[in-house]
Each structure stands twice: as C-alpha cells, then as structure tokens.
Amino acid sequence: MTPADAFLARGAMLRGIRSAPSRFGTHPPALWLGSREIAHLHRDEVDVRLTRVGIRALRAELLSDARIERRRPSSDWVRIRLRGEADVERALELTRTAIRRNRGRGAV
C-alpha cells in the first residue's frame, strides 16, 4: 500500500468523513465533511483544506515543516508530500484539524 493509499483509507475512517469523487476532478476519491471537500490527492501529495484562518493560526508550525507548502496566499489549502508513514500521520493530523476548522462552514 502506498502512503497515498494509506492516507485515503485511514482518512475515510475519521469521524464524519466520507469518501467521494473530488470536485476538482482528481482521480482518487477525496475526503468530504458534509458538503465540503477537505482533502484530495495529487499522486504522492495531499491537499488539505485548513481554511485561511486555520493557516494563519498554524503559520509558524506549518512554515517549520518542510513537507508542507501553502497553495497560494489567498488559499484555504496546504499541500503535504507523502513519502512514508510519518508523512501519512502528519497529513492525518492536519486533516483532523481541517475537520475542526471546517465544521459549520457548509460542512453539515
């Protein structure tokens, strides 16, 4: 099982999460919280929707982790490289944060 496969399998088991096609048209399924997509894959990388407020709150932590990059300054998303188990754990940790940040934002 690749790190990306492991992330999707374990992410889909998080409370309140379902797996469904991405609204962005990526091939693997995405992770959804209600009607809000909170994570999707790009081969061996995962984009996680932390929200802009969440990204600002975690700025120092995110900047200190070389595996993580911000998509764009005005984006709700960060991208995490998935190379091994530690990366999968980090991506799942950020996905749990995304769940908390996205509750009540269209994520019914």
Where are these regions (language model features)?
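Charge-dense, helix-prone N-terminal extensions
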Residues: M1-V108
